[in-house]
């Protein structure tokens, strides 16, 4: 890559391909980290968006292909894989979700498989995809991050979508009055109407923080684990470029060991995100607080 020092190499790999308004007023791609920062809130991380859409299409294609090839006789390998995934998610929903909503299982399946695919890209050696993007564009200084879940914008986007569903179903099941009652009449209550009114601000503060903590914790948990995993891969890659045989050999061993362990992290983070989504939506469907 274009970065010459270890510090520059690491910073280069942690910078997204950013599109936004340049200092001269034109719209274009940032060529430095400073330019990307100056673009502000309305900048787009093109690599994050691109990989999210691409892997979403891959997910749909795989499951659509399996559905078209479904047979009543001996199933093929792809069909077996898809059936295992569907049964696993369906069992998780039945064990965790206590309401009645036919959309929860498809949503949980989408969340699990999509996030798993986004995480899975982290197993590709850190230089391969950025170098490929640089060769295709002819720009050796091109910023390019392939793991969308190491971008907090992606994980926040996912968690905010779940949060919107939580609020929507809370209001749909309990009504606007029931939803507001949950925020203002719990956890403290009193038979004295004056005391109850005085407790409303306290209850609202506590319940609002609890409500907002759901999407924030979802996003930061996924981002933090995947970002740390990517950073370790980058640090191991720095060892390869040290020019020292022992460090390079150690880097090979560490890379394989961390990749094997990281498979567990990749799967676990997708599973945790899915399960918490199911739990939060189950709570939204409960009539009582």
From Swiss-Prot:
GO terms for molecular function: proton-transporting ATP synthase activity, rotational mechanism. Keywords: ATP synthesis, Cell inner membrane, Cell membrane, CF(0), Hydrogen ion transport, Ion transport, Membrane, Transmembrane, Transmembrane helix, Transport. The chain crosses the membrane at residues 43-63, 104-124, 160-180, 193-213, 232-252, 259-279. One of its GO terms (biological process) is proton motive force-driven plasma membrane ATP synthesis. InterPro entries: ATP_syn_F0_a_bact/chloroplast, ATP_synth_F0_asu, ATP_synth_F0_asu_AS, F0_ATP_A_sf. It is a multi-pass membrane protein. It comes from the Bacteria. One of its GO terms (cellular component) is plasma membrane. It is found in: Cell inner membrane. The keyword Cytoplasm does not apply. F-type ATPases have 2 components, CF(1) - the catalytic core - and CF(0) - the membrane proton channel. CF(1) has five subunits: alpha(3), beta(3), gamma(1), delta(1), epsilon(1). CF(0) has three main subunits: a(1), b(2) and c(9-12). The alpha and beta chains form an alternating ring which encloses part of the gamma chain. CF(1) is attached to CF(0) by a central stalk formed by the gamma and epsilon chains, while a peripheral stalk is formed by the delta and b chains. Belongs to the ATPase A chain family. Key component of the proton channel; it plays a direct role in the translocation of protons across the membrane. This is ATP synthase subunit a. It comes from Pseudomonas aeruginosa (strain ATCC 15692 / DSM 22644 / CIP 104116 / JCM 14847 / LMG 12228 / 1C / PRS 101 / PAO1). The gene is atpB.
């Amino acid at each position: 890559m274009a970065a010459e020092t270890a510090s520059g190499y690491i910073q280069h790999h942690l910078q997204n391909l950013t599109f936004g308004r340049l200092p001269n007023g034109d719209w274009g791609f940032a060529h430095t980290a400073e330019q990307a920062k100056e673009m502000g809130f309305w900048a787009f991380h093109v690599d994050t968006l691109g990989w999210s859409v691409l892997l979403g299409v891959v997910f749909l294609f795989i499951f659509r292909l399996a559905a078209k090839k479904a047979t009543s006789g001996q199933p093929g390998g792809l069909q077996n894989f898809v059936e295992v995934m569907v049964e696993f998610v369906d069992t998780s929903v039945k064990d965790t979700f206590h309401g009645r909503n036919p959309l929860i299982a498809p949503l949980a399946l989408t969340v699990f498989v999509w996030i798993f695919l986004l995480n899975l890209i982290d197993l590709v050696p850190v230089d391969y995809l950025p170098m490929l993007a640089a060769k295709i564009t002819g720009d050796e200084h091109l910023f390019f991050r392939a793991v969308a879940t190491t971008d907090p914008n992606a994980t926040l986007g996912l968690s905010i979508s779940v949060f919107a569903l939580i609020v929507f179903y809370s209001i749909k099941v309990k009504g606007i009055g029931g939803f507001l009652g949950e925020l203002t009449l719990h956890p403290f209550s009193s038979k004295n109407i004056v005391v109850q009114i005085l407790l409303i601000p306290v209850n609202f503060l506590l319940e609002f923080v609890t409500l907002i903590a759901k999407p924030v914790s979802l996003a930061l948990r996924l981002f933090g684990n995947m970002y740390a995993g990517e950073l370790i891969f980058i640090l191991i890659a720095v060892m390869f470029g040290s020019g020292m045989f022992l460090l390079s050999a150690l880097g090979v061993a560490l890379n394989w060991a961390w990749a094997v362990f990281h498979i567990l992290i990749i799967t676990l983070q997708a599973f945790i995100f899915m399960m918490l989504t199911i739990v939060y939506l189950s709570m939204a469907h409960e009539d009582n607080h």
